[in-house]
Amino acid sequence: MADIDNKEQSELDQDLEDVEEVEEEETGEETKIKARQLTVQMMQNPQILAALQERLDGLVDTPTGYIESLPKVVKRRVNALKNLQVKCAQIEAKFYEEVHDLERKYAVLYQPLFDKRFEIINAIYEPTEEECEWKPDEEDEVSEELKEKAKIEDEKKDEEKEDPKGIPEFWLTVFKNVDLLSDMVQEHDEPILKHLKDIKVKFSDAGQPMSFVLEFHFEPNDYFTNEVLTKTYRMRSEPDDSDPFSFDGPEIMGCTGCQIDWKKGKNVTLKTIKKKQKHKGRGTVRTVTKTVSNDSFFNFFAPPEVPENGDLDDDAEAILAADFEIGHFLRERIIPRSVLYFTGEAIEDDDDDYDEEGEEADEEGEEEGDEENDPDYDPKKDQNPAECKQQ
């Protein structure tokens, strides 16, 4: 049995050596043809694949032999380049600090528009006919006859029901339209989120550590007494001394929620469960009531606390990572473009971006597959040499 294994291993090693010899000795179009044929043969041999995988696994986390073989004087120059890279990261950090200052400046310019949005949503201000005029995209245009029919239908519906104030359930609809947020919203959260009037972002003052606060403004409701719920995100825009090359712009370092003053019996983040326990000796049964945590959007305001040593278990790390993503998404996308998420247009744009990338990849894959599966395909007829893509 050992002889058979040794023989198979020798054959595998020989096959791998054949690949290396083809690369070293052959040149030109003939090399490409033979390499392609040999690659196909190897990919169909599970033993060769296993041997290749073993070799690749051995290369993980190991420096390239070329760098290790460089003369000492060259390595010194490489170190000089690394020091330049650190200085680049420090300049980049200053750049992002100025970007944060610009965000603070332009937030003041955006605010009157967001205030008007708030007033329209909450029936404080009724927009004029001119403000309500909107020219649809060409693809959305319909005939005058259909427009008139739709107008009559709308008028009938308006007569049948009471005139709604503002835009009902605006923010709840936004949340339900976005997968990242709808996953957080439970059925018992929806009656509360119907009372959400506005979401604002406030940036830290000039000269203060970089941070931003999300403010959720609620109208009086039967669930809690808070008028505003807040979530504060602390950020850092400087390279880490222990790993300066990992710097890629500002990062969220931590977050703090707020206490929700729930009215009696209205805390949706907790639920009461009842368990029956049977006494081993007497056989009597008793019912035990226990309060446990409950899935809810409002857990967003009670993130895991990061201990002083910074060590978190896997669950807490996953929760915080998702929390940071949600906070960033609310700040960068939802608050500035909420109406487009309400109508679904922003979601369609996002989907189109992903679809286009996916379609391009699919088309490339189909073309490659068609060539290999075509019995009349002759690689020699392909006169265009493979391009070398430099990253």
Swiss-Prot record:
Residues bearing the modification Cysteine methyl ester: C388
Keywords associated with the record: Acetylation, Cytoplasm, Isopeptide bond, Lipoprotein, Methylation, Neurogenesis, Nucleus, Phosphoprotein, Prenylation
The modified positions for N6-acetyllysine read: K116
What do the Gene Ontology cellular component annotations say?
cytoplasm; melanosome; nucleus
Motif (Nuclear localization signal) spans which residues?
A: 273-279
Q: Which residues carry this modification: Phosphothreonine?
A: T62, T64
| UniProt main location, coarse | nucleus
Please tell me whether the keyword Protein biosynthesis is annotated for this protein.
Answer: no
**What's one GO BP annotation on this UniProt entry?**
positive regulation of neurogenesis
The UniProt comment on domains reads: The NAP1L motif is required for the histone chaperone activity.
According to its UniProt record, which protein family does this protein belong to? Answer: Belongs to the nucleosome assembly protein (NAP) family.
Describe, as the record does, how this protein assembles with itself and its partners: Homodimer. The dimer binds strongly and sequentially to single and double H2A-H2B heterodimers. Interacts with ERCC6; this interaction increases ERCC6 processivity. Interacts with RAD54. Interacts with SETD1A.
What this chain does, per the entry, is described as: Histone chaperone that plays a role in the nuclear import of H2A-H2B and nucleosome assembly. Also participates in several important DNA repair mechanisms: greatly enhances ERCC6-mediated chromatin remodeling which is essential for transcription-coupled nucleotide excision DNA repair. Also stimulates homologous recombination (HR) by RAD51 and RAD54 which is essential in mitotic DNA double strand break (DSB) repair. Plays a key role in the regulation of embryonic neurogenesis. Promotes the proliferation of neural progenitors and inhibits neuronal differentiation during cortical development.
Please identify the protein, giving its name as recorded.
Nucleosome assembly protein 1-like 1
